[in-house]
């Protein structure tokens, strides 16, 4: 579990308090571009199976990984090398899966990054070269072809009695390692209307986006369909030029509405609360009970000429201490900053604060959803 110095915690608390105060003072606005995506404009995932060669004995064990051996034989036969019946002994080849994201509106001949991951028992892909690997989409068509030298973020070194590993040496990346061979057709300029898909579904935010667009255009061209979708009808002056229309729309400022939510990460003790968190009237008390037990055995030694026996007498000390905390009353409609200040005034740490927030929620006095990660 990570530990932080008291000084670092104080600095973080001060920075968080300043941020919270500034957030309460003025509501932030965001561009529509940062709140929603254009429906249909997205990346597409690609995947392929290939071979990495040139490894320094750290590749797959062919006797243990049959698909690597079969792939190597098939590749050599396509190259005109007949090895049927021959015994292949090499540790310089590894079977890999190649993945990448085809960007929206990617044109034929442009390049994209790919990630290469070992599929067998290869120990290290350092220094390897990926051979030509077709990348397929969900429809089974080839959209790109990848090949190139791998860049590995981790490493592994071992001797006869010790081994050290840093990072993940069985995963590599090839920057601009794939060439796009097929384009995905998407006639944006011929669409009569466009839909905006909100990244965080919310009725109020969807309505505000539609209102901002209508105010900008002077017509009712935008309509919220549901909490996550706003439909835009392209005006006559932008017909056939949806790019110019969307460029103007994306820059409009909207104040998004946020649901009152508290995010709790119990593993690290991190608590994140939104600005709209409110609590009803509730009394909070917190105390810690500590039980300490110490053992100090006493040895009884008889006189040298006596016939007595040395004995050990147990001696236990039990102490009970309780940190007394005052009962604090949290008034109705308290804001986030007031809640944090009040709980800090009780000397409550992050771990105890998690339990208190859950208890307040169970009592029905907190107006927010609590999400535990």
Swiss-Prot record:
Q: Which InterPro entries match?
A: Flag_FlgI
Q: Where in the cell is it found?
A: Periplasm; Bacterial flagellum basal body
Q: Which residues, if any, are the signal sequence?
A: 1-27
What's one GO BP annotation on this UniProt entry? bacterial-type flagellum-dependent cell motility
Q: Name one GO cellular component term.
A: outer membrane-bounded periplasmic space
Task: Enumerate the UniProt keywords alphabetically.
Answer: Bacterial flagellum, Periplasm, Signal
Stored Pfam families: FlgI
Q: Provide a Gene Ontology MF annotation, just one.
A: structural molecule activity
Main subcellular location of this protein, as a coarse class: periplasm
Subunit (UniProt): The basal body constitutes a major portion of the flagellar organelle and consists of four rings (L,P,S, and M) mounted on a central rod.
HAMAP family xref list: FlgI
The family classification in the record reads: Belongs to the FlgI family.
Function according to Swiss-Prot or TrEMBL: Assembles around the rod to form the L-ring and probably protects the motor/basal body from shearing forces during rotation.
Q: What is this protein called?
A: Flagellar P-ring protein
What organism does the record attribute this protein to?
Rhodopseudomonas palustris (strain BisB5)
């Amino acid at each position: 579990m990570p530990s932080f110095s008291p000084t670092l915690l104080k600095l973080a608390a001060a920075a968080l308090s300043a941020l919270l105060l500034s957030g309460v003072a003025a509501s932030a606005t965001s561009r529509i571009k940062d709140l929603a995506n254009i429906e249909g404009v997205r990346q597409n995932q690609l995947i392929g199976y290939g071979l990495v060669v040139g490894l320094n004995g750290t590749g797959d064990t062919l006797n243990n990984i049959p698909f690597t051996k079969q792939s190597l034989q098939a590749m050599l036969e396509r190259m005109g090398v007949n090895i049927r019946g021959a015994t292949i002994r090499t540790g310089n080849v590894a079977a890999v899966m190649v993945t990448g994201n085809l960007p929206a509106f990617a044109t034929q001949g442009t390049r994209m990054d790919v990630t290469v991951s070992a599929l067998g028992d290869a120990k290290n892909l350092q220094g390897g070269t990926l051979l030509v690997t077709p990348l397929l989409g969900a429809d089974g068509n080839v959209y790109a072809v990848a090949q190139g030298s791998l860049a590995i973020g981790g490493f592994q070194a071992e001797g006869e009695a010790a081994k050290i590993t840093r990072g993940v040496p069985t995963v590599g990346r090839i920057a601009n390692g794939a060439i796009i061979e097929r384009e995905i057709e998407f006639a944006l300029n011929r669409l009569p209307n466009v839909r905006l898909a909100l990244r965080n579904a919310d009725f109020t935010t969807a309505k505000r986006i539609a209102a901002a667009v209508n105010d900008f255009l002077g017509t009712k061209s935008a309509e919220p369909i549901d909490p996550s979708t706003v439909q835009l009808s392209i005006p006559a002056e932008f017909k056939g030029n949806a790019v110019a229309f969307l460029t103007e729309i994306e820059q409009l400022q909207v104040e998004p509405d946020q649901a009152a939510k508290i995010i709790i990460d119990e593993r690290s003790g991190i608590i994140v609360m939104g600005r709209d968190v409110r609590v009803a009237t509730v009394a909070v008390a917190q105390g810690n009970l500590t039980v300490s037990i110490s053992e100090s055995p006493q040895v009884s030694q008889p006189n040298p000429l006596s016939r007595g026996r040395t004995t050990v007498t147990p001696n236990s000390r039990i102490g009970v201490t309780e940190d007394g905390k005052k009962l604090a009353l949290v008034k109705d409609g308290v804001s986030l900053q007031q809640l944090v200040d009040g709980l800090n005034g009780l000397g409550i740490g992050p771990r105890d604060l998690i339990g208190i927030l859950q208890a307040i929620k169970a009592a029905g006095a907190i107006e927010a959803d609590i999400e535990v990660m």
